[in-house]
Each structure stands twice: as C-alpha cells, then as structure tokens.
Amino acid sequence: MNVLTIKGVSIGEGMPKIIIPLMGKTEKQILNEAEAVKLLNPDIVEWRVDVFEKANDREAVTKLISKLRKSLEDKLFLFTFRTHKEGGSMEMDESSYLALLESAIQTKDIDLIDIELFSGDANVKALVSLAEENNVYVVMSNHDFEKTPVKDEIISRLRKMQDLGAHIPKMAVMPNDTGDLLTLLDATYTMKTIYADRPIITMSMAATGLISRLSGEVFGSACTFGAGEEASAPGQIPVSELRSVLDILHKNTRG
C-alpha cells in the first residue's frame, strides 16, 4: 500500500490520521466550530456541507469554503456533502449534487473532496478528472447504515473505488453484532495486504464498531473520525480520548 502525502501529512503510515467534522448549521456556527476544532489539532478537518442551512445555494457554499480556507490556514480541508440516501442531513437531486461538487473543486481552496461511489460511474470519473486538474484528492465513499455486507462485497466496493480513481477509498458499515465488526476488520486487512495500492479508510459504526475506529494501524485503516463539537456518525468518540488510544496502540504494537 502506497503512502499518500498531502501538505506534509502522510496518510497510510504510522498512526491513523484524525479527521474532525464541522457540523454547524449556520455560517457563524461553522466558522466558530472551525476555530474550536483547530485547537484540537486534527490532521484533517471535514466540512459536512449537507448540515449547512444554505447547502442548496452554491454561491453561499463557495464563499464559505473561502472563509474556512482562511480560518483553517494550512490544515487539510475535506469537503463532504453526504447524500440523504447514505445517511446525510439533506435531500438533493443528483444533478445538483454533482454541480455542487464541481463548484467546490473549482474553488481550489479544498484539499480533499468526498465523492460517493454510487453516483454513476461516468459522473464519478468526470469528477475525479476535474479534481486531479485542480490538485484536489478524492475520498470515494460508500455507507451502509443498515447492515454489514459480506467480506467479498466490502472488498469489491473498495476495489471498484480504486478502479474509478479514488485516491482514498472509504467504506462505513453498520454492525448488528460483533461478528459483523470482525467481518469489516477482516475485509480491511485483506484489502490492505492483497489489493490496496493506496490508503483506505474503513469503519464499523455505533458502539459495537468502536474498536474499528481505534485499531486502524493494526488492521489497515489510514484515517479515523473523532467528534469535535458534535459527532457526524454513530460511534465517534471525543478527539482527546481517540488520540490517547491511537497513541497507546502506536507505541506498543510495533514489532
């Protein structure tokens, strides 16, 4: 698995990189949250645009991207609009979703962008090309809030993301029992050791899946999400607790 280094942050080696989401609804809340989150020193700050009250207004979104870029300084900035069908806060038709991502990429003020795998292969490929032209890295994602697919299906989706040009494939699943957690961890380890030629992010959600958010360095997930002001998905824990566990594992599990 190759390491991806963006602005000096090496994704795919050492401790999993910590991503903190911004979950504010208003511009003021989001900018205040960005200032607070910076103090927690994440590796990557994610703006969850689907929570923003003006997410349908592309001009408002691009203006806020510019303000966030100034606030975050050189911190890595991930732009994510999570669609409703994949657990997001806002309904948006596909053409509007694609246009929003295009606008975000063309600001050149973001470092990474989330593109959902099931947005149509041609659409995804076009967005990946646009991202690469603008020096934006692609986190390609899929989320199952109902269940954990079988191991081969998880691997198949992650491999498809690689084939479509993802710089970082990402998969999040919901466990119904601890066996599902083991399925996700097994799929992650197999993907990392056999198929992945780039960093991947995986997680099993909710309380049952918590160990997957902590054990990325062991099984092969390159980043993990911690809660800043507010969690963006079930199972996220506060960043200070997350970092201390990652640190313990990093110091004590290396051969």
Swiss-Prot record:
<comment type="pathway">
    <text>Metabolic intermediate biosynthesis; chorismate biosynthesis; chorismate from D-erythrose 4-phosphate and phosphoenolpyruvate: step 3/7.</text>
</comment>
<keyword id="KW-0028">Amino-acid biosynthesis</keyword>
<dbReference type="GO" id="GO:0003855">
    <property type="term" value="F:3-dehydroquinate dehydratase activity"/>
</dbReference>
<feature type="active site" description="Proton donor/acceptor">
    <location>
        <position position="143"/>
    </location>
</feature>
<dbReference type="GO" id="GO:0009423">
    <property type="term" value="P:chorismate biosynthetic process"/>
</dbReference>
<comment type="function">
    <text>Involved in the third step of the chorismate pathway, which leads to the biosynthesis of aromatic amino acids. Catalyzes the cis-dehydration of 3-dehydroquinate (DHQ) and introduces the first double bond of the aromatic ring to yield 3-dehydroshikimate.</text>
</comment>
<dbReference type="InterPro" id="IPR001381">
    <property type="entry name" value="DHquinase_I"/>
</dbReference>
<dbReference type="InterPro" id="IPR050146">
    <property type="entry name" value="Type-I_3-dehydroquinase"/>
</dbReference>
<dbReference type="GO" id="GO:0008652">
    <property type="term" value="P:amino acid biosynthetic process"/>
</dbReference>
<feature type="binding site">
    <location>
        <position position="236"/>
    </location>
    <ligand>
        <name>3-dehydroquinate</name>
    </ligand>
</feature>
<keyword id="KW-0057">Aromatic amino acid biosynthesis</keyword>
<dbReference type="GO" id="GO:0009073">
    <property type="term" value="P:aromatic amino acid family biosynthetic process"/>
</dbReference>
<feature type="binding site">
    <location>
        <begin position="46"/>
        <end position="48"/>
    </location>
    <ligand>
        <name>3-dehydroquinate</name>
    </ligand>
</feature>
<dbReference type="InterPro" id="IPR018508">
    <property type="entry name" value="3-dehydroquinate_DH_AS"/>
</dbReference>
<keyword id="KW-0456">Lyase</keyword>
<dbReference type="Pfam" id="PF01487">
    <property type="entry name" value="DHquinase_I"/>
</dbReference>
<dbReference type="GO" id="GO:0046279">
    <property type="term" value="P:3,4-dihydroxybenzoate biosynthetic process"/>
</dbReference>
<dbReference type="InterPro" id="IPR013785">
    <property type="entry name" value="Aldolase_TIM"/>
</dbReference>
<keyword id="KW-0704">Schiff base</keyword>
<feature type="binding site">
    <location>
        <position position="82"/>
    </location>
    <ligand>
        <name>3-dehydroquinate</name>
    </ligand>
</feature>
<protein>
    <recommendedName>
        <fullName>3-dehydroquinate dehydratase</fullName>
        <ecNumber>4.2.1.10</ecNumber>
    </recommendedName>
</protein>
<feature type="binding site">
    <location>
        <position position="232"/>
    </location>
    <ligand>
        <name>3-dehydroquinate</name>
    </ligand>
</feature>
<comment type="similarity">
    <text>Belongs to the type-I 3-dehydroquinase family.</text>
</comment>
<feature type="active site" description="Schiff-base intermediate with substrate">
    <location>
        <position position="170"/>
    </location>
</feature>
<comment type="subunit">
    <text>Homodimer.</text>
</comment>
<feature type="binding site">
    <location>
        <position position="213"/>
    </location>
    <ligand>
        <name>3-dehydroquinate</name>
    </ligand>
</feature>
